[in-house]
Amino acid sequence: MHPRPSPIAASLYTLRDLDADVIILHGPHGCCFRTGRLLETDGVRVLTTAMSEQDFIFGASDKLTETLRKAYEMFSPKLVGVVGTCASMIIGEDLKEAVQRAGIPARVLAVESHGGFGEGDNTEGAIIVLEAAAEQGIIPEEEAERQIKMLKLATEIEKTRGMAQGKYIRPSYGDDKDEVALRVLEAIMEGRRVAFVLNAKKETSYLFADTLTLPFGSLNPDNPPIIIANLDKGIGLPRIRRHAENILSEIERSGNRVEHITGGLDEYPITGARAAEILRNEEIEFAVVSGVPHALPVEELGLESVAVTDGPRLVEPLRGLGYTHVVAELDAHARTLGQRSIVESDFGDALRRNIKKVI
């Protein structure tokens, strides 16, 4: 009943992950404005055909053809994405025909997405891009199938454990970060078995990995927390692998070490269960789970726990799952787009402040 991410935005992000140089939105100039502006900070040129009221009646394929040609003249792109919107798809615009007429010497992926595509889940927009990319040989068929499987599992998690459960969820900003930070530090100093779990999605991991670089050894040298993370640098598209490699390097430079790798940064729907098994085997008593904490079956573990999420509408579902404490990081996408190194998080700052107080 509340607004949720759009398939159009997911199409844009997935084209970015494929290293598209230019993305053209075939629709009104305000459609997906925020996402388009954010992606510009990540090195992608986002253009629009700026459809108007008259175009809704008579069509705007000529505008798309012209925009494609101008885009090539300005940027000489190797890969261009053309993404449909509600306006262009409702009137039946033929994106592929306009692309053929443009005749630019670049690879062009035409994606007939819109706000209600499929069942309206944002992952539908990502899936249609992956299918088109595999069809054109941009990515292997097996890689597309793997990612589509992950996206479908992610949708299932959101519908059963997250903010897409079909009811109105009141936004909340979670517990006081300083109070929760003190509770984490007390657990380490008391000698309890503590683990930090990164189960994050793509570039948002630059924010959620911040807590993995802190000097916890100064609190209790004989009881450093265990670090578990979905940072396999051999899984995913090249851009996603680079994110994992960058973060692992920074963690190592901080003097900390990732003891357990659960999978890749696009495998968060399944790495939560793997992390839970490690928590059981390591007999962990206190866990801090960051990124997509609702993908980890905390209700099966019987431990004190902290969920660190980026969604105000995920706070209440996470409490319902059994997390002892929940804190929210705002604007994770906006803060991490275009980043190539770890970004300081609000909860990380709370931990830093309180480490200084207790030492």
From Swiss-Prot:
The coiled-coil regions, if any, are none
As for what it does, the entry says: Involved in the biosynthesis of the unique nickel-containing tetrapyrrole coenzyme F430, the prosthetic group of methyl-coenzyme M reductase (MCR), which plays a key role in methanogenesis and anaerobic methane oxidation. Catalyzes both the six-electron reduction of the tetrahydroporphyrin ring system and the gamma-lactamization of the c-acetamide side chain of Ni-sirohydrochlorin a,c-diamide to yield 15,17(3)-seco-F430-17(3)-acid (seco-F430), the last intermediate in the biosynthesis of the coenzyme F430.
- Give the protein's recorded name: Ni-sirohydrochlorin a,c-diamide reductive cyclase complex, component CfbD
InterPro entries in the record, alphabetically?
CfbD (IPR017675), Nase/OxRdtase_comp1 (IPR000510), Ni-siroh_cyclase_CfbD (IPR052673)
Q: Which UniProt keywords apply?
A: ATP-binding, Iron, Iron-sulfur, Ligase, Metal-binding, Methanogenesis, Nucleotide-binding
- Required co-factor? [4Fe-4S] cluster
Give the EC number(s) under which this enzyme is classified: 6.3.3.7
Enzyme class at the top of the EC tree: ligase
Q: Which reaction does it catalyse?
A: Ni-sirohydrochlorin a,c-diamide + 3 AH2 + ATP + H2O = 15,17(3)-seco-F430-17(3)-acid + 3 A + ADP + phosphate
**What's the domain of life for this entry?**
Archaea
**Family classification:** Belongs to the NifD/NifK/NifE/NifN family.
Q: Quaternary arrangement and interactors, per the entry?
A: Homodimer or monomer. The Ni-sirohydrochlorin a,c-diamide reductive cyclase complex is composed of a NifH homolog component CfbC and a NifD homolog component CfbD.
- Which GO molecular function annotation, any one, does this entry have? oxidoreductase activity
Q: Name one GO biological process term.
A: methanogenesis
